Amino acid sequence: MSLPARYYTKTFEDNGATIRILWVDTAPMIDKYRNESETYPDACKQDYQQQLSWIDSVLTAAKEDWVIVAGHHPIYAETPKDESERADMQARLDPILRKHKVDMYICGHIHNFQHVRVAGSDIDYITNSAGSLARKVKPIEGTVFCSPEPGFSIVSASKKTLELRMIDKKGNVLHTVTRSK
């Protein structure tokens, strides 16, 4: 199975609620990836400004009960990886998400669970763990929850609530993020 495009959107219905999810290609938004064309040949070929315009237009038209944006790289998270990655995401993608009051931004990349809330934003920034390799994590400013456990997350919704459950490899719910309207 292949993805429909490098970035795309789909609407789901769950329990009478509608959820719009945008999957975005974050590597081209990060200078490090665009500038290292031999290591990351695809990132430098992409027009990230065109993608940001598309994201803005899709979010402008979004009428669903809940909106989630999913990408590979974190906007806010604790990680030993290069700080410039998050700085680029904060400068490029985050202002659009805040403008449109997105409910959640979900990412991976750093292989642990994190739930971060930052001052001035109502977005829940979620880092999902990995099914195998997991990495150590420590709280940063805005951390609501963090865990190095391997696992996965499940999202469910109703008209009044959006819920994301972080589940470890044994099936235990480690943390629940609940948004209400």
What are these regions (language model features)?
Residues 62-79:
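Short acidic, glycine-rich surface-loop motifs adjacent to enzyme active sites
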Residues 26, 70-74, 109-110, 167:
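Short, well-ordered beta-to-alpha junction loops that form the rim of enzyme active sites
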Residues 1-63, 83-88, 92-104, 112-162:
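Extended active-site neighborhood of metal-dependent phosphoesterases/phosphodiesterases
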Residues 171-173:
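Residue-level signal for glycine
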Residues 68-70, 106, 126:
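Structural detector of well-ordered beta-strand residues that form the stable sheet scaffold
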Residues 158, 167-168:
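C-terminal domain-closing interface element
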